[in-house]
């Protein structure tokens, strides 16, 4: 997992995007123009949660979780040559348990 100096605020998470498949199961190479945008990644940083009155709502998502996120959610970032996505917690659809 990457060590980044980006700290998400409130209920946001920073996700390192998984690599898109470059070949099919039968060995055909998929060109960049035909690749699907990945919707899976690993949480490398998570905010403390949003405020509800004077209290913070705890986050269900934590650093190290592998998550599935909304296809069009978040803000793409490049940091130290790596691609990340900054998402609101509501854009995370599921946590993949291993």
Curated annotation (Swiss-Prot):
Highest taxon, organism lineage: Bacteria
Which terms in the Gene Ontology molecular function aspect does this entry carry? ATP binding; metal ion binding; protein folding chaperone; protein-folding chaperone binding; unfolded protein binding
Cellular component, GO, one term: cytoplasm
The protein's predominant localisation is: cytoplasm
UniProt GO BP? chaperone cofactor-dependent protein refolding
CDD domains given in the database record: cpn10
The answer to whether the entry has keyword Cytoplasm is: yes
The listed locations are: Cytoplasm
Which keywords fit this entry according to its UniProt record?
Chaperone, Cytoplasm
> Quaternary structure per UniProt?
Heptamer of 7 subunits arranged in a ring. Interacts with the chaperonin GroEL.
Family named by the database record: Belongs to the GroES chaperonin family.
Q: What does this protein do?
A: Together with the chaperonin GroEL, plays an essential role in assisting protein folding. The GroEL-GroES system forms a nano-cage that allows encapsulation of the non-native substrate proteins and provides a physical environment optimized to promote and accelerate protein folding. GroES binds to the apical surface of the GroEL ring, thereby capping the opening of the GroEL channel.
Q: Matching HAMAP family, A to Z?
A: CH10
Annotated protein name in UniProt? Co-chaperonin GroES
Biological source species: Corynebacterium diphtheriae (strain ATCC 700971 / NCTC 13129 / Biotype gravis)
């Amino acid at each position: 997992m990457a060590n980044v100096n980006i700290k998400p605020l409130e209920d946001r998470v920073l996700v390192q995007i998984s690599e898109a498949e470059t070949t099919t199961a039968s060995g055909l190479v998929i060109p960049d123009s035909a690749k699907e945008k990945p919707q899976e990644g690993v949480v490398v940083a998570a905010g403390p949660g949003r405020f509800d009155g004077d209290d913070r709502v705890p986050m269900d998502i934590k650093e190290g979780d592998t998550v599935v996120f909304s296809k069009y959610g978040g803000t793409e970032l490049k940091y130290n040559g790596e691609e990340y996505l900054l998402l609101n917690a509501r854009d995370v659809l599921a946590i993949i348990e291993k």
